[in-house]
């Protein structure tokens, strides 16, 4: 039986990054898919620590909060930088990803029709810090921090992929980010996962907007 279990809705959502991480690292995991009907029934929601998913099980350890799960996997699988300085930078990147993801989620679920144009106009300013970070790390030719992949890379990759769907061409003005997406997406195990039905057939969000 796989050591990991992901309990989540049938969407990519906040689990896409951790699934990419597990697939790329050659880890197996079990999916427990929660339908809207099951969630609305209420008992599962009541059992969740914060009343929300994802829920993640690593043996007898149960975790909630998607970024906590990513950090846990970062620590246990060696994806948290090579020293404390790199770990701090990885945290900084991941917090920046979370800031933009929250804005994206707010747009998708509360203000898509009225707010999309303004969101897309402001997007270059939101993406620029990540281009800057890449430029400061070995000329942008490796990862977002250091010379080995971290959990923040998977989270940033997912963030960039969903924004390419929302605003095609949004990375055209950011050559390092554009190359970064291509480079990470071409990693053999990750490439296979991104082409798999388990990824392709899942909607990005739960309301059909993207």
Curated annotation (Swiss-Prot):
Reactions that this protein is recorded to catalyse: RX + glutathione = an S-substituted glutathione + a halide anion + H(+); prostaglandin J2 + glutathione = prostaglandin J2-S-(R)-glutathione; prostaglandin J2 + glutathione = prostaglandin J2-S-(S)-glutathione; prostaglandin A2 + glutathione = prostaglandin A2-S-(S)-glutathione
EC number: 2.5.1.18
Classification via Gene3D superfamilies: 1.20.1050.10, Glutaredoxin (3.40.30.10)
Gene Ontology terms, MF aspect: dinitrosyl-iron complex binding; fatty acid binding; glutathione peroxidase activity; glutathione transferase activity; JUN kinase binding; nitric oxide binding; protein serine/threonine kinase inhibitor activity; S-nitrosoglutathione binding
Domain GST C-terminal: 83-204
Subcellular location: Cytoplasm; Mitochondrion; Nucleus
Residues of the signal peptide: none
Modification type N6-acetyllysine: residues: 128
Keyword Nucleus attached: yes
Database matches in Pfam families: GST_C_3, GST_N
Residues with the N6-succinyllysine modification: 103, 116
Keyword vocabulary terms for this entry: Acetylation, Cytoplasm, Lipid metabolism, Mitochondrion, Nucleus, Phosphoprotein, Transferase
Ranges of residues in domain GST N-terminal: 2-81
Chain positions found as Phosphotyrosine: 4, 199
Entry binding sites for glutathione: 8, 14, 39, 45, 52-53, 65-66
Modified residues (Phosphothreonine): 62
One annotated GO biological process: negative regulation of ERK1 and ERK2 cascade
A GO cellular-component term linked to this record: TRAF2-GSTP1 complex
Role: Conjugation of reduced glutathione to a wide number of exogenous and endogenous hydrophobic electrophiles. Involved in the formation of glutathione conjugates of both prostaglandin A2 (PGA2) and prostaglandin J2 (PGJ2). Participates in the formation of novel hepoxilin regioisomers. Negatively regulates CDK5 activity via p25/p35 translocation to prevent neurodegeneration.
Protein family according to the UniProt entry: Belongs to the GST superfamily. Pi family.
Subunit-level organization: Homodimer. Interacts with CDK5.
Protein name: Glutathione S-transferase P
Organism field: Homo sapiens (Human)
């Amino acid at each position: 039986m796989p050591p990991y279990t992901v309990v989540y809705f049938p969407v990519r959502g906040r689990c896409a990054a951790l699934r990419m991480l597990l697939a790329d690292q050659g880890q197996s995991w079990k999916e427990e898919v929660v339908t809207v009907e099951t969630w609305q029934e209420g008992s599962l929601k009541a059992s969740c620590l914060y009343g929300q998913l994802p829920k993640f099980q690593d043996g007898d350890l149960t975790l909630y909060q998607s970024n906590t799960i990513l950090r846990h996997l970062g620590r246990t699988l060696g994806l948290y930088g090579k020293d404390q300085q790199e770990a701090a930078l990885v945290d900084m990147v991941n917090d920046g990803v979370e800031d933009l993801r929250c804005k994206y989620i707010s747009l998708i679920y509360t203000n898509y029709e009225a707010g999309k144009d303004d969101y897309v106009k402001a997007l270059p300013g939101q993406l620029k810090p990540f281009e800057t970070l890449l430029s400061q790390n070995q000329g942008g030719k490796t990862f977002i921090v250091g010379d080995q992949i971290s959990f923040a890379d998977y989270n940033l990759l997912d963030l960039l992929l969903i924004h390419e769907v929302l605003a095609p061409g949004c990375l055209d003005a950011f050559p390092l980010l554009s190359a970064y997406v291509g480079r990470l997406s071409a990693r053999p195990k990750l490439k296979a996962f991104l082409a798999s039905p388990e990824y392709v057939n899942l909607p990005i969000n739960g309301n059909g907007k993207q």
